[in-house]
Amino acid sequence: MAKQIIFVQGAGEGVHARWDSKLVASLERELGESYAVRYPQMPGEDDPDYAAWRAELISEFDLLEDGAILVGHSIGGTILIHVLAEQPPKFRPGGLFLIAAPFIGEGGWPSDDMDDRKDFSERLPPGIPVYLYHGADDDIVPTAHVHLYAKALPHAVVRVFEGRDHQLDNDMSDVARDIRLLD
């Protein structure tokens, strides 16, 4: 049976179909048939509401089994880690992969929906491997955000790619390599 991955999209009009679908296609190509990537369209992608995305993620979590890999891009990664910190899922995640995720709180972005968190290490499911990725040429989320997450998650693996943008130039080969390392 194929190993499960859920990919949580970023926000913005048409992001699911026009932008993050390219990341998913790259990930599927790099990982091959041994992995099955779920790519749900999140509600109100052009103006995400935390409560609505949270409810959607919790529903998606019910479909996942122990060892499933969680991947979030941009605000999808931000919401994913906040949901995990608030309400650990019933399954045991095999890994958490955040790509160009905005950090909410001091030094990062403000939010009316999400609490500032500095306690991710204590709140995430115990032992979950965490990987943080960011393109150094990201013109949407400053690279400083990945370092804020790194401070909140000292056990995380951090990868910053020179010359790559918010979409990591639609190249998920490094993410796929790290996912395969968990097997």
Model-derived features: where do they sit?
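Short, surface-exposed "cap/lid" segments of acyl-processing enzymes
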Residues: 2-46
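Acidic catalytic loop of the alpha/beta-hydrolase fold
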Residues: 14, 136-141, 166
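Short alpha-helix in the alpha/beta-hydrolase fold that links the catalytic acid
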Residues: 20, 142-151
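Catalytic histidine-centered segment of alpha/beta-hydrolase-like enzymes
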Residues: 48, 164-176
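Catalytic active-site module of serine/aspartate enzymes centered on a nucleophile-bearing elbow/loop
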Residues: 60-63, 171-183
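Gly/Ala-rich beta-loop-alpha elbow adjacent to hydrolase catalytic centers
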Residues: 71-81
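A conserved short beta-strand
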Residues: 90-104
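Short beta-strand/loop motif that positions the catalytic acidic residue
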Residues: 126, 131-134, 138
